[in-house]
Amino acid sequence: MRSGVFVAVLVVVVFALLTQGQELHVPEREAVANLAARILKIVHAPHDAAAGVPHKRNSELINSLLGISALMNEAGRR
């Protein structure tokens, strides 16, 4: 799945560069190269390492997105 995402992002970046390559300045080109390198690092990393991305359980992700952890901490203090 990660390979598919990488290929899709890479295709989008390549097409964007081909169509607007003359409009990109040096900082923008460096940003594109940096993002491509990060995506490549994530794709080629072992599944459990995920290139230094901290592992969170699904419940932790949901709670952090909904802000439930802050509410639970406040409720626990009462």
Curated annotation (Swiss-Prot):
Q: Name one GO biological process term.
A: chemical synaptic transmission
Instruction: Indicate where this protein resides in the cell.
Output: Secreted
Is Transmembrane helix tagged as a keyword?
A: no
Q: Which residues form the signal peptide?
A: 1-21
Task: Please verify whether the record's keywords include Secreted.
Answer: yes
Q: What does this protein do?
A: The pigment-dispersing hormone causes the migration of the distal retinal pigment into the proximal end of the pigment chromatophore cells and thus decreases the amount of light entering the retinulas. May also function as a neurotransmitter and/or neuromodulator.
Q: What is this protein called?
A: Pigment-dispersing hormone 2 peptides
Recorded family membership: Belongs to the arthropod PDH family.
Q: Which UniProt keywords apply?
A: Amidation, Cleavage on pair of basic residues, Hormone, Neurotransmitter, Secreted, Signal
Alanine amide modification sites?
A: A75
- Source organism (scientific name): Callinectes sapidus
- Gene Ontology cellular-component terms listed: extracellular region; synapse
Where this protein primarily resides, as one coarse class? Answer: secreted
Q: Name one GO molecular function term.
A: hormone activity
Q: In which tissues is it expressed?
A: Eyestalk sinus gland.
